[in-house]
Every structure is written in structure tokens, then in C-alpha cells.
Amino acid sequence: MDFLLNIIPAAITIATVFLLGSTGETLMEKTGHLNLGIPGIMCFGTVGGCLGVRLVLVMYGTNPENANYFLLVLFALIGCSLLSALAGLIYSFLTVSLKCNQNVTGLALTTFGGGFADYFMSLINKDGFADASNIINTPLPFASSLGIFGKLVLNYNIFVYLAIAIAITVSFVLKRTRVGLSFRAIGENPQTADAVGINISKLKYISILIGSMIAGLAGVFYVMCFVGGSYENSSTIQSFGWLSLALVIFTVWKPDLAILGSFLFGFLFILPNTIEVSFVVMKVLDLLPYLVTIIVLIITSISGKKSVQPPSALGLAYFREDR
């Protein structure tokens, strides 16, 4: 029981990074854009969120431990959203307006995002970030009074519940709303969508910008909520970005399934650090998220069911004259 009480909260916390990244990517892929720039966008989100936190800490001078919880969360969200949207705007301009190759553009954005984060995070004064992290990580006020249930389900910061709410909302929008139907139509057959009057470029821009803002939250969450406000380099954040891309495939492009899938990825990520195993076994366990993703990809490809396949126009630029 003690083992579960320790590993489940840690798995849920790191699962939030995967969930935010995969939800943002799924929204983009539903409109036909395979954005391999997700790791870079998460780096942009990290810088923006940390700048927001820094602005709040400046207000409190030498007493960062007294910083206001609401302001820290709000400024982190605003800063993260702005820079993540900027990264998404760069990607969408290149791939939607200029019709650049999506894979090349995404990889370039990931490389640029890593360098961008490493440079600007080295300039940001991180004094007080540990205090800000402690404040942001404040769990729900009544969690401690509900025993095991409170510790396993309610003992998390607001970002965890925000990530779940975002995933559920995106799933609902894609399945149950007119704009979601338009998104899916663009991803499956943009020629037909264009023929019935759907504004392809406009909706692609919207999905990419919103998806980027969601994915960017994963970066600032990792720094401020998982590693206590510290930052060494962008490589770890980018590794979570690649795992988020794998999670999209693992959960067959369904944000609601990503809630459970992200917990599994989080559990597999935490497991090697909580049990005593050899170095070789630890590395094998690190590979498991990728291995299970490959297995799922093989199974879905063999099954041939449309409901578990990627959007038909995924990764393809749309040229109206080809209609």
C-alpha cells in the first residue's frame, strides 16, 4: 500500500506533462497537421511561463515566499500561452500559408525551441522559483482530510485538474460540436470540406494555435510543478515532447483515452526510479512507452478500423487547385 501511495501521485503528476502535450498535438493532427515541433513548443511554453512567474516574484522583492497563488498561476498561464501561441503561429504560417513540409518545419521548430529555451532560461533570474513552485503546487484545501482517497485523487495542484478538464473539453468539441466536425472533415478530406464552404486555412490556424497553447503548458508545468522550479537544459523537456507524440498514437487520436494513457506512461516513467533494478533493466523499462506505442500502431494498422486510424490527410499540405 505504501508503494502505491508513493508511486501513484508521482505518476499522475508526470502524466500531466504527457496529457497536455498529447492533447495539443491531437487537436492539430485532427486538422491534418503532424506537428513534430511539439517538443520545441513545450520549450517556448517553459520560457513564457517562467517569465510570468518572474514578473510576479519581482512584485514581492525579497519575500518570494509571500507571493500570491492566484497571480503566480495566472501570470504563468498568460506568459506560457503567449509564447506557445507565437511558436504555433510560426509553424502555422510556414505549413498552412507557405505550404512548407510539415515534418521538416516541425523538426526545425523543435531544434529552435530547444536553443531558445536554453538561452533565455539562462538569462532569467530563478531566485525564488523554488518558493513559487511550492506555492503553485498547493493541493486542494480539503485533500488532507479525506485519507487515502484525498491523497490519491485530490492531493494535486490546479494544473493537474486543468489538464484533465482540457482533455475532456477537446474530446467533447471534436466529437459533439460543429467546429469539431469541421476540424475532423479537414483532416480526413480537405477537398470535400473546402467544397462545402469550410474555411480550411482559418480553422487550421485556430487548431494549431490552440493546440500549441495547450502543449506549451506541459513545459511550464514540468519546471514549476515537477522539478521544483529548477532548469538545467531543454533536453528533458523535449524528451517528454517526443513521448507526448507517441501517446497520441497509443491512444488512437482520442483525447479522452489520453487521460488513461498518460497515466500509464507516467507510471512506466516513474517505475524504474522507485524499484531496485539493474541498469540494463532500468533502460528496458524506459523503452516500454515506445514499445507499447509500436505494438498499438501495428495492431491498429492490421485491424483496419477507421475509428483507430490517423486522419487521412495527416501530414499533407492542402493545395486548393488540386481539388
Please place each PLM-identified region on the residue numbering.
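Membrane-interfacial amphipathic/re-entrant helices at transmembrane-helix boundaries
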Residues: 1-22, 30, 34, 48, ...
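Hydrophobic core segments of alpha-helical transmembrane domains in multi-pass membrane transport
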Residues: 21, 46-50, 114-118, 160-172, ...
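Loop-to-transmembrane alpha-helix initiation sites
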Residues: 103, 131-135, 155-161, 204, ...
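Alpha-helical transmembrane segments within multi-pass membrane transporters and channels
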Residues: 62-112, 265
